[in-house]
Amino acid sequence: WKCKKDDHIRFQREEPGFSPLFIHEAASGSKETFGWKSAGYDDSSWARALPYPEGQVSGAVSPGNLLPRTVPFMYRKERFFTALSDLKKSSHSAEDWKDFLSLQKPLLIPANNEEIVEIHAGEEMTGYIHTGFTQGKGSRISLLYAEAYVQDETTGPNRIPVKNDRTDKAAGHLEGYEDCYVLSGLGTRETPEVYEPFWFRTFRFIRLHIQTGSDPLVLLDLHYTETGYPLA
């Protein structure tokens, strides 16, 4: 085994005070790790994994506690987004975005441009997000995950947004936690730049916000791998 600390991923708070998850990311592409899953990647600078002495790792997370599974493995199923929910701001038509989501037809985002689109998974989902790009050096991508469109009014001491019709984009707006990624611009059609948050996300809607810099960006892919425990 070899290992390398990735200094280009930082886990960020979901809330300014108590942060219940601490799994959402502020990440950026890096020449050091670009293509690290490829067979020809040069890992000569990576450190070799070393055995650790007893007591260095807490017993609560020690491999010595491993036992045979009593439940099935979580399943994985490749899924695509079913629809475009709302086109907030874009240089492309709704049909262009639908072709990108359903057919994975590449979408060119011009330089110095902002895109805000909201997409629909069809139902509440749990899955691993996968994105793929070429070009776009310095472009900033954010993915906000939401279960519903919520109202401006809130309820209770914690000021929780009120939910009426969860799909009402006209009278509501999306609120949720997000991942942010800044592109290195190293991606090509043969070897795209890929961003996949480490842990799965739960969502019914996703708001995709793109801000390009001086380099145009090509969106190649946005889908997810559904996961969960089998119900039967």
Give the location of each predicted region.
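Extracellular/oxidizing-compartment recognition motifs
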Residues: 1-232
